[in-house]
Amino acid sequence: MPYSRSRARQEFENKSVELVSLARQISYKNVALSYEHKNLIFQSTIVLLCSSLEEYLRVFIEDLFFNYKSLSATISEIPVNPRTFSLFHKQRTIYEGFINNRDEFKILDRLNITNQRLYSVVDSTQTFVDHIDSKMIVNDKKYPSPKNLKILFNRIGIKSIFNETDRIGKKNYELLLRSFLDVRETIAHQESTDLTFNDVKRNFKNITDLLDKLDRASYSHICSISGQKYW
């Protein structure tokens, strides 16, 4: 099946068009704004671009598991990594509790091999309901740093996300992302950052390109394991 854009990507692109349009409108010389005011608006679009990328990651992950649930996927149709991460996350909180209180009775009860809620992700025949919490997968890794993207996409089974994006797009997307985040961090720390509309346009073009490759890599991964209907 040919690639189709995720809902998360469509929302990102709609927001990007609005932001670039705003930056373009205030960039003209006849607009009655000072250089400082224009620069603040340009900076704001960069910060909002980063927020839009965060939102893409959140919506993409949450939509994926919503699709699994609404279409009654079996556990076997879900990639192994999110199932394993879910089990690890639940067990980790149990072990952390044991480290604090050394209550062996409680940990044996909670880790009991008959605990269906804990080990349900192991049973490939079950129908997916709420076995995996999508927020648990994405919430602590949605800030789009290269490190977070590597971890987040590994959680859904893509072990080397930048290898995939670089293969598809024939360029170094991790470097592209770092370059954008350098600008965003400079703005966040209120350091002097003079931007032009061309700077804004270039950053939006680069991040939209990155997101295109993230979306395509994810599409191929989900379709190969789960099937196109869950996209």
Segment roles from a protein language model:
Residues 1-4, 27-35, 42-47, 114, ...:
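Generic, low-specificity signal for short hydrophobic/alpha-helical stretches with a mild N-terminal bias
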Residues 49, 61-165:
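Helix-loop junctions and short alpha-helical segments
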Residues 1-25, 144-231:
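Polyanionic, low-complexity intrinsically disordered segments
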Residues 41, 45, 49, 172, ...:
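Secondary-structure capping and boundary motifs in well-ordered enzyme cores
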Residues 58-59, 188:
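General alpha-helical segment detector with a strong preference for membrane-spanning helices
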Residues 1-47, 59-66, 70-81:
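Charged alpha-helical initiation segments
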Residues 47, 51, 205-208:
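Short, well-ordered alpha-helical segments
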